[in-house]
Amino acid sequence: MHRQRHAQTSLYWQDDRSFELPVSYYHAVNNWGTSPGFSATVPNFNRLIGTDCFECHSSYISHKKNTAAGDHYFAADAAVEILDKNSLVLGIGCQRCHGPAAAHVNFHTENPGKQTAGHITANKTLNRQQQLDQCAVCHSGNDKRKIQSRFMFRPGDLLANYFLPAAVADSTRHFDVHGNQF
């Protein structure tokens, strides 16, 4: 089971939108500090947490786009995410890395004596690229253009089917606080 190893950041809800708090708890120093990307001197409580964040920092959240006309630049519609906070599955569960588990759970519920895991993807059955892509779906940074939701990714899928290559960006203007960990 995945747990917070480095830091823990909280959020708050305002209607159907969530916002990141500017302080985080850092386990290495056993203390609170400024959350990544926030100013240490100017408090900001307006950093919107959208589906992209939940796709790697939770197991699931139901969401939809609400396109509403309004007073916007060039009269364009504004797409606003509507998150269902009651559907949020906190933490990273088994299915995020091993795929859908309903058949696995049903089989082992009916056969409690069976000790061999079945009806679920074991990492050793994936080739090297599939294993790398499975981790990279969340640990390769946020500099690529997403084609489809990370929630749809299943073991054995190719990362190239989820993201387009990144355009060269000015790293000082669009800093990725995730550090491209992969």
Model-derived regions, located:
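A cross-kingdom signal targeting lumenal/periplasmic-facing segments of multi-pass membrane
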Residues: 1-40, 48, 55
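Primarily the internal scaffold of c-type cytochrome electron-transfer domains
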Residues: 1-3, 9-14, 35-37, 62-182
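Short, flexible loop/turn elements at secondary-structure junctions
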Residues: 25-27, 57, 98, 139
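Membrane-entry segments of alpha-helical transmembrane domains in multi-pass membrane proteins
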Residues: 39-49, 87-90
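C-terminal substrate/ligand-recognition segments
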Residues: 48-50, 54-64
